[in-house]
Amino acid sequence: MRKKLLSSLLVTAMAVTMLAGCGSNGGQQASTPATENKTETSAEAKTDDTAGTDTASTTTTEGGKIGVAMPTKDLQRWNQDGTNMEAQLKEAGYEVDLQYASNDIPTQVSQIENMINSGCQMLVIASIDGDSLGTVLEQAKEKDIPVIAYDRLIMNSDAVTYYATFDNYMVGTKQGEYIRDQLDLDNAAGPFNIELVTGDPGDNNARFFFGGAMDVLQPYIDAGKLVVKSGQTDFETVATANWSTETAQSRMDAIISANYADGTKLDAVLCSNDSTALGVTNSLEANYTGEWPIITGQDCDKPNVKNMISGKQSMSIFKDTRTLASKVVEMVDAVMKGGEAPVNDTTTYDNGTGVIPSYLCEPVFADASNYKELLIDSGYYTEADLK
């Protein structure tokens, strides 16, 4: 059973998403390219964001047509998710319409509407904002088009058939446990200073990440073993709109200036993912002169793995998108053939209309001691990628 903190965060999530409304943009990422009003192309096709809408495959196949909607090409992980899924679906005999929406909600809504009207028989959607797709998905429901929410749960829509993701609560607990173990919180005298940085408030996953980590760390904060010098501990305060590197960096700049400029030691920064960890690292390099703190992350993006190798980031949760893509292809194939998708969780993920049957893949963490085995030996990256 999830603990009280996670339950509280999810109640808050429901309130936030109800207030967000359809089409709410929630603030866009500061690093968004100037051409982001354009529809992004398939990562397999042109990578120029000005290239316009791209249908990833136009060849008719016997398997049927699957629409795959990804949020943005701004983050490396979504490129990998999209291309991995596209390749595996094509290999399984399906035509694929893969679209990226440049983190623009109206663009994603339009892309999904086009998928519905162009004959897609099933949709796989990684939403930009979990509460923004209810209206367009009513159209999918009316046409009996099954929907798999991919990695981000789509909220308040009974059109969602399945959810495929990694165990997001476990992601957070692994990050919290890493900090606990590295600081030896059960034995060391302390106190230790920590700051907290999590993700987009419109992304339901961010609350699971933060909830899992805080279920590990909160007892040490309550006991005074961990001290948040900034005083910023509630989810809404430590959230980072659009997981923006620049936003995380600006916030960390202010925290360092107010709390650590006098030489006070910062021992750890809980970062829920790699884009926020990169912002924290950039800020520390520019503003912090003390001993380097523990920094967590998630996704094993190339710049962050390079930072792990050089000692600037301590760890990153590795979510092998090939594994998730493979599972989604299994789910799609089962449903398209008239069966039920394989799931392993039927209790955890309630999107406001009921519990969504889910398949959860298990994450692992990478650090300087095991990244070669996890990332290079497995073929996820080459050594040249990390030079």
For the regions a language model picked out, list residue spans one by one:
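A residue-level marker of the well-folded mature domains of exported/periplasmic proteins
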Residues: 2-5, 18, 22-387
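Hydrophobic core
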Residues: 10-18
